[in-house]
């Protein structure tokens, strides 16, 4: 089972360079591919980032709002136009504003080609946005996205074309089997909606095995998507704690492997 990592980025070049240096230090030999979705005219500012990547793909220009809500389509375009030519069994999807302080294998030891692991995965009917750990969810549906017009469009489309159970997720990263990437990239383009429910629902409908669990209490204490950005002092304090499943998100500032003790 050979992993690769897709590093998605669009701003803060120096921070991106330091993230990649940390990833390289913690995961020697790991292929790391880049997906740039920023302004085309600013790609030249990221020459140092590109030097640290095994490959770099530039996504066609889109608004920040579109890119955020269609992250699954962004990744699928990368796979169709570039990723399918790279060898890997499963793919880590890692955004530039995430900092992992432990090797990837501490979080996910391995994955089969037809599997998906999303830490926040749960049935849509049980999505309580107040509870991050899906295994501790109240089972009561409370999610603001369900009130958006685009969800109604998705729901209508889903009933007509699939009708299978709906899933959703809010996660700091995703780990996707290669076969999942291939099937999804062929089928996703006509499906309306938002990536946080479209991706897991469609992946499952296409035969992916969805995985849950495997994350420590420390992981869920550290991951708070709505928190204020981590400060450098907070990150350095966490870096001095014992290894485990340590992560910081969002964290926007550069910090070197030497500072972190990697």
Model-derived segments and their meaning:
Residues 2-3, 25-34:
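Short loop->beta transition adjacent to catalytic acidic/histidine clusters or analogous donor-positioning motifs
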Residues 4-12:
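A conserved hydrophobic helix/loop-capping motif in glycosyltransferases and polysaccharide synthases
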Residues 36-89:
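Active-site-proximal specificity loops/subdomain of glycosyltransferases
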Residues 87-97:
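Short beta-strand-to-loop acidic/aromatic patch adjacent to the donor-nucleotide binding site
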Residues 12-26:
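Short, well-formed alpha-helical segments that are part of the catalytic scaffolds
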Residues 180-262:
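C-terminal catalytic/acceptor-binding lobe
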Residues 11-15, 41, 97-101:
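Short acidic, S/G/P-rich loop/turn micro-motifs used as interaction or catalytic elements
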Residues 99-192, 196, 200:
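Conserved catalytic core of nucleotide-sugar-dependent glycosyltransferases
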């Amino acid at each position: 089972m050979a992993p690769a990592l897709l590093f998605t980025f669009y701003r803060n070049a120096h921070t991106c360079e330091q993230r990649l240096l940390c990833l390289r230090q913690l995961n020697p030999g790991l292929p790391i591919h880049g997906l740039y979705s920023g302004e085309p005219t600013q790609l030249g500012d990221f020459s140092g980032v590109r030097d640290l990547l095994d490959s770099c793909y530039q996504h066609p220009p889109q608004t920040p709002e579109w890119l955020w809500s269609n992250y699954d389509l962004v990744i699928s375009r990368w796979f169709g136009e570039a990723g399918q030519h790279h060898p890997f069994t499963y793919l880590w999807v890692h955004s530039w504003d995430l900092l992992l302080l432990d090797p990837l294998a501490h979080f996910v030891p391995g994955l089969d080609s037809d599997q998906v692991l999303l830490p926040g995965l749960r049935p849509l009917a049980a999505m309580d946005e107040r509870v991050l750990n899906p295994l501790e969810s109240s089972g009561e549906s409370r999610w603001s996205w369900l009130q958006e017009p685009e969800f109604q469009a998705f729901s209508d489309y889903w009933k007509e074309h699939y009708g299978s159970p709906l899933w959703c997720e809010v996660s700091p990263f995703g780990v996707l089997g290669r076969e999942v990437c291939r099937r999804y990239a062929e089928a996703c383009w006509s499906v309306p909606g938002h990536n946080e429910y479209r991706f897991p629902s469609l992946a499952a409908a296409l035969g992916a095995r969805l995985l849950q669990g495997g994350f420590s209490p420390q992981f869920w204490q550290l991951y708070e998507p709505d928190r204020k950005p981590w400060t450098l002092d907070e990150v350095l304090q966490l870096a001095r704690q014992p290894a485990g499943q340590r992560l910081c998100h969002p964290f926007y500032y550069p910090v070197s492997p030497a500072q972190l003790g990697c």
